Amino acid sequence: MMTDPIADMFTRIRNGQSAAKVAVQMPSSKVKVAIATLLKEEGYISEFSVSGEVKPELAVTLKYFEGKEVIEKIKRVSRPGLRIYKSCDELPKVLAGMGIAIISTSKGLMTDRAARSAGIGGEVLGFVE
């Protein structure tokens, strides 16, 4: 049984890039698809797809630039044993705005910039640099 599926997703992406894999696969969920959508919109991954009906699998195609991984660091912040919630004013800036923080808000998952412009806070799921 997996206790933290988001941390598992981040670990699979981190390990896949360390091993210079083209793509990584993991069990799919709505939250993982939303995170993959954010990563694609921000240019951290090439693409993703969901396949299978009984046990859906999420395949994430990793992105490299001149042989180096695009995601230098991906880290889980809020975890099941210690949730981290921040208001709009307290939302963290990752690498002075060069990275993103993934925020779970009442309006869905969004980046720290989008949450700040919408004026809403939420749970800080992780950082991507």
UniProtKB/Swiss-Prot annotation:
Assigned keywords, A-Z: Ribonucleoprotein, Ribosomal protein, RNA-binding, rRNA-binding
Pfam family, one: Ribosomal_S8
GO biological process, one term: translation
A cellular component term, taken from the record's GO annotations: ribonucleoprotein complex
InterPro entries: Ribosomal_uS8, Ribosomal_uS8_CS, Ribosomal_uS8_sf
Molecular function per GO: rRNA binding; structural constituent of ribosome
Annotated PROSITE patterns: RIBOSOMAL_S8 (PS00053)
Subunit structure, interactors included: Part of the 30S ribosomal subunit. Contacts proteins S5 and S12.
Cited function: One of the primary rRNA binding proteins, it binds directly to 16S rRNA central domain where it helps coordinate assembly of the platform of the 30S subunit.
Assigned protein family: Belongs to the universal ribosomal protein uS8 family.
UniProt protein name: Small ribosomal subunit protein uS8
Natural source organism: Colwellia psychrerythraea (strain 34H / ATCC BAA-681) (Vibrio psychroerythus)
Lineage, uppermost ranks: Bacteria, Pseudomonadati, Pseudomonadota, Gammaproteobacteria, Alteromonadales
Name of the gene encoding the protein in the UniProt record: rpsH
